[in-house]
Amino acid sequence: MPNSSSTSQPATTGSETASTSYVNYVEMSAEQEYFLYELETTDSGSMGLVLRAIYDTGDVQSFARALQQRISHYDKNIQKVCSFHYQSFVDAMQELMKLKEQCQDIKEETVAIDAEIQQISQRLCQKKQEIVRYRKLMKNAKTAMDQIAVCLPVLENYAKLQEQMSNRKYYQALKTLEELEHTHLALVEKYRFTQVLAKSMAPVRLEIKEKAYSEFKDFLENIKKVAGRIGKHASKDTAEQHSFGVTDAERAKKIQEEARKNASNVEIEVSADGSIVKKNMSPKRNMKMQVEDDEQVSAQDLIDFTPVHRCCQIFNVLGAKEEFEQYYRQQRKEQCDLVIEPTHKMNNFKHYVEYLDEIVGFFVVEDQILMTQSNLSTTVDKDKLWDNALMKIRQHLDARFGGSPDVLMMLKMKKVILLFILTMKSYGYAVAPLYELLQNFRDQYNEILVKEYCAQFERDLEKDNYTPITVNSEEEFRTIIRKFPFYKRSMEQEPFPRRFPFSPFVTDAYTQAKNYLIGCLKFMDNLQLNTSAVDDTVRRCANVLLGRWAGVLKSFVHKRLSMIQLVQITINLGYLEKSCESLGAFITSKTSGEEAIGTTSHQVVLSEKVFRDVRSEVEQQIDECMRSKVDEIIDLANYDWELPAAAGQASEFISDLINFLQTTFTSFTNLPSGLAKHVCTQTCKHISQSMSDFLLSPETKCISTGALDQFSLDVMQCEMFTTRCPVAGVDPQTLSMTFADLRQLLDLVMSSDWTTFNAEYGKDHAKYLRVKASTAIVVLEKMIEFERKSTGFFGIAKGDRKKLLDTIVRQLKLLEI
């Protein structure tokens, strides 16, 4: 330390010397002093301003030297202070090191003493605790030995209760719990452990109730899983009982198979004395028979109803019988709502079957529970549940199945729904609304059938050749007779080829009608309808079909059909009308049997009148077609009204017209007599009117005597045709009267018998009764016009004839007044 002090003194002296020398050589202005003062005293934020001011003075080097001088001065002062205090610092550090060593020794001694005290205290506490524990053990053991005999029954029963709870014997656990509470706990209730037991047993009832509810929910879930199988077996049993969907042939085959199966179990042997001995054999059954036996199960075999009985017992003991009954009904109602609500789209036949099987299974289980636990559900509750389900079932089936356009699908579903009805009915459920649903489906089914057969009817109309059927052999003849009920005396003796009056369309339509009726009967099978109701319904369906067919025909005949087509349609209509009687007999044979044919009392009669409107339309079309064809031929007429003399033979168009009439009227052989007469008469009237229009047409300005003779000759040809008309039953005299008006007019004008006409005009016995004065005037004026045009006809010598004709015209005009 002294050395250090002595060493620092020379250094200080040297520093001061250096500083003094620096001060002596550096001069510092007042401005530099100010700047240094500012740098020493100002904060860092204002330092930039001071530095900028220094640079602004322009004497940076002088300031740098002044700054260096100031730094050197401060360094010297720091060295002085350090040199002055250095020895004292060294002495203080040496004393501090000594004090540290002493403190460490004291600390170690203190820790050792504390550890020893802790060990001694711990051993003392352990000894004390052991003494206290042993004394308590001795006392408690003595007390326990005295009271254990009293507590053992409680503990044994409690253990029994726990075991029963773990084994899910809840009803027995309830009985044990009651014994504990009312018998054993009362004897040891002063002990605290009994309170613990009582507290632990308090939630046992609630736990048992929850477990019972859980077990019942599992039972409901199991019902939901196997409801479809139960319903399937129940439906199968019902189908077997009612021989549902089994024909007589299938039933006989099944009986034979059962007999053969039973016979295979018997072996016949001859004993020693010669007698026959039967031995029952028990062969191993194959897998198929085992599967059949497995299917012969009931609801009791598929479902264990024990949980229901157990829950009833448990809730009776708990005093919550009404609560469980209400819970049961609510759960079954919710489950019923789930069952009757389809879980998928009903777009498959299998889906419909599964849906109805689940419903059957649900209500079969409900019926079984009602029989075994009558307190859970009553007949009223069951009926209410069924009524609600029935309404929704009907809605779902009607919504999802009612609009089905598939006839085969509807027939299949009808059988499924009918089997569902019979199954539910066998369990005592009301099924009348389902029969109503089937009847609604029947109407929809019939409507679909009608549309299909109407479409087929229209196709048959389009493809028909409208030619009478011709057969070339006995086999073909019998085929047509089997298809359509046609009878004609002595037709079987006619040589081949034989011709029927109707076209193939009639046999096709009659066959389609029978197929339609058979289709209607298929849906009505087993619908709880008596024979009379079925017969009436089928007849109404037949009338509907005939009415629709009449509508199709009515639309068809408005197309542009030929005369041959119209005539054949009329003939076909006649035979279709006649076939209604045979259709009625066919319906009776299908609904009441062959022996009931001929009994028509209280039956809906097949309406033959449905084709009347169509017949009228066809007749009108025939009239129009005839008039149109006649007009086409007459339009070919090209009269030369100034012809000087007649040609001596009928005009060409008249010959064509008569040939056409001859051919057409000949084809009317199979037409109804009245229609043929009507068409013939109306056609002749139309020809007469058309010829009159020719003669009286305003376009014809003049008529020569030769033209009038030719016109009269043409009319005469028409009159001759009426006398030999090929239409059977037509009175030639009556038919000739269609040209009477025209003939009297021609006779009057050509004979110039005006005196007779004027004298007898308006009288009943007049010779020219059918001639009107106005008509005669028109023809006469045209003849006068022709004479006027003729060269020199009205010359001086002919003045008297002109006056005569003018006088006749004036007299005729007076007759009109």
From Swiss-Prot:
Keywords: Coiled coil, Exocytosis, Protein transport, Transport
Biological process (GO), any one: Golgi to plasma membrane transport
Superkingdom field: Eukaryota
UniProt-listed InterPro entries: EXOC6/Sec15, EXOC6/Sec15_C, EXOC6/Sec15_C_dom1, EXOC6_Sec15_N, EXOC6PINT-1/Sec15/Tip20_C_dom2
GO cellular component terms attached to this protein's record: exocyst
Coiled coil residues, start to end: 87-149, 247-270
Subunit structure: The exocyst complex is composed of sec-3/exoc1, sec-5/exoc2, sec-6/exoc3, sec-8/exoc4, sec-10/exoc5, sec-15/exoc6, exo-70/exoc7 and exo-84/exoc8.
Known function: Component of the exocyst complex involved in the docking of exocytic vesicles with fusion sites on the plasma membrane.
Pfam family, one: Sec15_C
Key word Transport present: yes
Name under which the protein is recorded: Exocyst complex component 6
Family: Belongs to the SEC15 family.
